C-alpha cells in the first residue's frame, strides 16, 4: 500500500518513517524522497510489494512553502548553518517580486555543500563537516511556478513548484545574490508531491500516483506474465503498469516492444489476491 504522511519539524525523515512502520506493524517500507530534519511536510511511503513501484511514481514536480530571510548568508544556505555574510541593503517589495518571478523556468543551480548529494560514494555534508574542500557540480533544474504570499522585509514567504533535484535553499541563496544582497532559508514545508496534498493524508491509491499508462489485462494474460513469459499485444512501445480487468490495484509493470509484451516487475501476492477475489465474485 501507499501512504501519505506529514513529517513534523525536528525529527529526521527516517525516524518519522520508522515510527509510522512500527505503529502500523509494517515490516517492509520505502519512501519516494526525504526531508531535512528542520523541514516539515509530506512524505510518500510504500509498504510490502508496492515498494517496487516507487521507481515509477510521478516525481516530476514538488511544491514547497518557504520562508526567506534577506541580508544573511550561511554555509548551509539556511538558518541552521554558520553565518558567513551579511548586508544591510534594503530592497523594495517590487524589486523582490520581480526578481523572484524571474526564476520561473529553467536555470542552472549549484547544490548546497551541506546536502545529501552523493560525491564519490559519500554525502556532501560528510565532506563539509570534515572541512574538506569539494566542488559541487552545477545542474539544470526547473521552476514551474512561484507565488509570493507575504513580504515583510527582511522576511519573504513564497510557494514554489519545482522539478526533482531542485534545492530550495540554493534557489533562495541565488535570489539573494540576484538582489545584490544575501538570503537564507528560515523555514520549509513540502505541500505537494506526486499530485497529492495534505487533503490526501492516509492511504493513497497507486493509480493516482503512477507515472505510467495503465493497461487492463485478462486473467490468462496476467498469468502468462507472472510466469515470466511474453505474448503479442498490439500497443505502442513503452512501459506500462497493468491491472486485472477494472480492479484498482496495480499488479505489475511490463514493457512492449514491437508489439510483444514482456514482464518487468510482477507482484505475485497481489495477483493471487485479485484473482481469488474475482473467482469468489463469479
UniProtKB/Swiss-Prot annotation:
Responsible for synthesis of pseudouridine from uracil-55 in the psi GC loop of transfer RNAs. InterPro entries: PsdUridine_synth_cat_dom_sf, PsdUridine_synth_N, tRNA_psdUridine_synth_TruB. Its EC number is 5.4.99.25. Belongs to the pseudouridine synthase TruB family. Type 1 subfamily. It comes from the Bacteria. It is an enzyme of class 5 (isomerase). Keywords: Isomerase, tRNA processing. NCBIfam families: TruB. SUPFAM superfamilies: Pseudouridine synthase. This is tRNA pseudouridine synthase B. GO terms for molecular function: RNA binding; tRNA pseudouridine(55) synthase activity. Signal peptide: none annotated. It catalyses: uridine(55) in tRNA = pseudouridine(55) in tRNA. GO terms for biological process: mRNA pseudouridine synthesis; tRNA pseudouridine synthesis. The active site is at 36 (nucleophile). Pfam families: TruB_N (PF01509).
Amino acid at each position: 500500500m501507499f501512504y501519505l504522511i506529514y513529517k513534523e519539524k525536528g525529527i529526521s525523515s527516517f525516524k518519522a518513517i520508522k515510527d509510522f512502520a512500527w505503529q502500523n506493524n509494517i515490516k517492509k517500507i520505502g519512501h519516494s524522497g526525504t526531508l531535512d530534519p528542520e523541514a516539515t511536510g509530506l512524505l510518500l511511503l510504500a509498504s510490502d510489494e508496492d515498494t517496487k513501484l516507487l521507481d515509477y511514481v510521478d516525481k516530476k514536480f514538488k511544491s514547497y512553502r518557504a520562508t526567506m530571510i534577506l541580508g544573511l548568508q550561511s554555509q548551509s544556505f539556511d538558518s541552521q548553518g554558520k553565518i558567513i555574510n551579511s548586508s544591510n541593503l534594503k530592497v523594495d517589495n517590487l524589486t523582490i517580486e520581480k526578481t523572484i518571478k524571474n526564476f520561473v523556468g529553467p536555470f542552472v543551480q549549484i547544490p548546497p555543500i551541506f546536502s545529501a548529494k552523493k560525491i564519490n560514494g559519500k554525502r556532501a555534508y560528510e565532506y563539509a563537516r570534515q572541512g574538506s574542500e569539494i566542488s559541487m557540480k552545477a545542474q539544470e533544474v526547473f521552476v514551474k511556478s512561484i507565488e509570493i504570499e507575504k513580504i515583510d522585509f527582511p522576511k519573504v514567504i513564497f510557494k514554489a513548484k519545482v522539478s526533482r533535484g531542485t534545492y530550495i535553499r540554493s534557489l533562495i541563496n541565488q535570489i539573494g545574490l540576484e538582489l545584490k544582497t544575501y538570503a537564507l532559508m528560515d523555514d520549509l514545508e513540502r505541500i505537494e508531491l506526486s499530485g497529492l496534498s495534505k487533503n490526501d493524508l492516509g492511504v493513497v491509491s497507486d493509480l493516482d500516483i503512477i507515472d505510467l499508462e495503465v493497461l487492463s489485462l485478462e486473467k490468462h494474460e496476467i498469468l502468462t506474465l507472472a510466469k515470466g513469459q511474453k505474448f503479442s499485444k498490439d500497443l505502442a512501445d513503452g512501459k506500462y503498469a497493468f491491472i486485472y480487468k477494472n480492479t484498482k490495484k496495480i499488479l505489475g509493470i511490463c514493457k512492449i516492444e514491437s508489439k510483444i509484451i514482456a514482464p518487468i516487475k510482477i507482484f505475485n501476492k497481489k495477483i493471487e489476491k485479485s484473482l481469488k477475489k474475482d473467482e469468489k465474485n463469479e
